[in-house]
Amino acid sequence: MRTRLLLFSCLVAIANPLMAGNPARARRPRLELRATPRMAFSPVLVFMTAELRGGEDSEEFYCPALVWDWDDGGRSVQEADCPPFASGNTVDRRFTAEHAYRAAGVYNVKVTLKRVHRSVAAATTTVYVRSVLGDPGESE
């Protein structure tokens, strides 16, 4: 009976990542999103860069689709160009997109990485667009 209890305890410790210090969480890549420019006058073409960095490559982050929510009613989907998968490599991937803003506003742009219809990472940044000085449509 003692042997069974000891074996059960060992299996629980291995199967539960919280008890094992959760090393998988420490190796999880992070997604960063940048806009260039972040502040501009309308109309403006904004270039976005999403970088997936750090952690070890895994099937979860291999060949994601990107969903861009431009916060102006527009949305676009981009399929990733996939390098050959090799387990244990460090993740360092860069994705780019561009979007034109024609109206003044504060836009919270969000990119979501999806794999097999499941979100695996997301990041948000803010873009500030002002009307041209002296534009009758600009309110003070």
Q: What are the functions of these language-model segments?
A:
Residues L5-V12:
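Sec-dependent N-terminal signal peptides
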Residues N16-E140:
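Extracellular/lumenal mature domains of secreted and surface-exposed proteins
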